[in-house]
Swiss-Prot record:
It comes from Aspergillus kawachii (strain NBRC 4308). Glycans are attached at residues 151, 331, 381. Its EC number is 1.14.99.56. Lytic polysaccharide monooxygenase (LPMO) that depolymerizes crystalline and amorphous polysaccharides via the oxidation of scissile alpha- or beta-(1-4)-glycosidic bonds, yielding C4 oxidation products. Catalysis by LPMOs requires the reduction of the active-site copper from Cu(II) to Cu(I) by a reducing agent and H(2)O(2) or O(2) as a cosubstrate. The lineage of its organism: Eukaryota, Fungi, Dikarya, Ascomycota, Pezizomycotina. Has a modular structure: an endo-beta-1,4-glucanase catalytic module at the N-terminus, a linker rich in serines and threonines, and a C-terminal carbohydrate-binding module (CBM). The CBM domain is essential for binding to and subsequent oxidative degradation of polysaccharide substrate. Lignocellulose is the most abundant polymeric composite on Earth and is a recalcitrant but promising renewable substrate for industrial biotechnology applications. Together with cellobiose dehydrogenases (CDHs) an enzymatic system capable of oxidative cellulose cleavage is formed, which increases the efficiency of cellulases and put LPMOs at focus of biofuel research. InterPro entries: AA9 (IPR049892), AA9_LPMO (IPR005103), CBD_sf (IPR035971), Cellulose-bd_dom_fun (IPR000254). Residues 1-20 form the signal peptide. PROSITE patterns: CBM1_1, CBM1_2. Its cofactor is Cu(2+). It holds the Pfam family AA9. This is AA9 family lytic polysaccharide monooxygenase A. Disulfide bonds join 63-186. The gene is eglD.
Length: 408
């Protein structure tokens, strides 16, 4: 890691803030698009804007602003299903930029029973990815390369309603206390299979992080060799002990981030032999990326292939039981890079796989010199429109970035 490289990124960050913000907008189940979920009749507890949460003690850390309000719909899944989260800055168009490339950081996924999770309790981490020294890549870099998509495999938990909480921590201002930006939403699911692996007691959100945690107060612009992913260990998919903060690591296939459409494999939790992602429920050929997945529990190397023809295959974070520090994933990068090969197998070492960032739409101004909602409307060096479309107001976030947000 060269200090000069990140010094340049620091300068670039201010000018790219218009592309910074992001939200989860859709979900895929076994390769099948579930449609927009951030609508009034959707299945995502969506905030009123795509702005980050920066106060780790705020109740907005649980499911974002208005996250205590239930969404209209709930998606049905079963153990072993592959769930793909799709992030965007503005919309699902091809021009959407997902998240600014300067916004380096980890991507994680938590889950909790709906009633408890809504109150900020019993959150269990099922996937994580951070920094890869061997390729000098962050999880957000991989997310961008994969068009804002990342996967988890539904663990073999008892039937019931659950919230899945994908999260991005952007560290472009992480060199100062309170500078890290948190992006998260809660997606509503009903698990229809009835597994025997109860979730651990988990952690509280807010409560799991502090503003001075090593992975939150972190300077990406100075030289470093590793990165400590914040939060608890990734659950192994079977143990019922409490999920507390500790050391862990996660491996991700950087090769899967290439814009290829090779077939990828999915493995299932221990109670199932394989997930046929190419079955009728999964549509063998999809318009978006077919997930690369590892399971929430060890399996017998059973796999199933999916063929994708359009976008890059989403990266799956194959997690493992952790004994060493949560730092660079270099020990597993080579083996996981093989995951991207067509019809390759992935055996998940006892944990749920998951995540990649969102696709943000470009912040270009709309016709007529009026900025659309979520687009930039002012700040240092801004040369675009300063007037927002009807229903939006121009809000100052910092001297460099003003954004059109919904009128209150």
């Amino acid at each position: 890691m060269k200090t000069t490289t990140y010094s340049l990124l620091a300068l670039a960050a201010a000018s790219k803030l218009a592309s910074a913000h992001t939200t989860v907008q859709a979900v895929w189940i076994n390769g099948e698009d579930q449609g927009l979920g951030n609508t009034d009749d959707g299945y995502i507890r969506s905030p009123p804007s795509n702005s980050p949460v920066t106060d780790v003690t705020s109740t907005d850390m649980t499911c974002n602003v208005n996250g205590d309000q239930a969404a209209s719909k709930t998606l049905s899944v079963k153990a072993g299903d592959v769930v793909t989260f799709e992030w965007h800055h503005s919309d699902r168009s091809d021009s959407d930029d997902i998240i600014a490339s300067s916004h380096k950081g980890p991507v994680q996924v938590y889950m909790a029973p709906t009633a408890k999770g809504s109150n900020g309790n019993n959150w269990v981490k099922i996937a994580e990815d951070g920094y890869h020294k061997s390729s000098d890549e962050w999880a957000t870099d991989i997310l961008i390369a994969n068009k804002g998509k990342h996967n988890i495999t539904v663990p073999d938990v008892p039937a019931g309603n659950y919230l899945f909480r994908p999260e991005i921590i952007a560290l472009h201002e992480g060199n100062r206390e309170g500078g890290a930006q948190f992006y998260m939403e809660c997606v509503q699911f009903k698990v229809t299979s009835d597994g025997s692996n109860e979730l651990p007691s988990g952690v509280s959100i807010p409560g799991v992080y502090t503003a001075t945690d090593p992975g939150i107060l972190f300077d990406i612009y100075n030289s470093f060799d590793s990165y400590p992913i914040p939060g608890p260990d990734v659950w192994d998919g079977s143990s019922s002990g409490s999920s507390s903060s500790g050391s862990s690591s996660a491996a991700v296939s950087s090769a899967a981030a290439a814009a290829t459409t090779s077939a990828v494999a999915a493995t299932t939790p221990a109670t199932q032999a394989a997930v046929e992602v190419s079955s009728s429920a999964a549509a063998a050929t999809t318009e978006a990326a077919a997930p690369v997945v590892s399971s929430a529990a060890p399996v017998q190397q059973a796999t199933s292939a999916v063929t994708s023809q359009a976008q890059a295959a989403p990266t799956t974070f194959a997690t493992s039981s952790k004994k060493s520090s949560k730092t660079a994933c270099k020990n597993k990068t080579k083996s996981n890079s093989q995951v991207a090969a067509a019809t390759s197998s992935v055996v998940a070492p006892a944990a749920t796989s998951s995540v990649v960032p969102v696709v943000s739409a470009s912040a270009s101004a709309s016709a007529g010199g009026v900025a659309k909602q979520y687009e930039r409307c002012g700040g240092i060096n801004h040369t675009g429109p300063t007037t927002c479309e009807s229903g939006s107001v121009c809000k100052k976030w910092n001297p460099y970035y003003y954004q059109c947000v919904a009128s209150q």
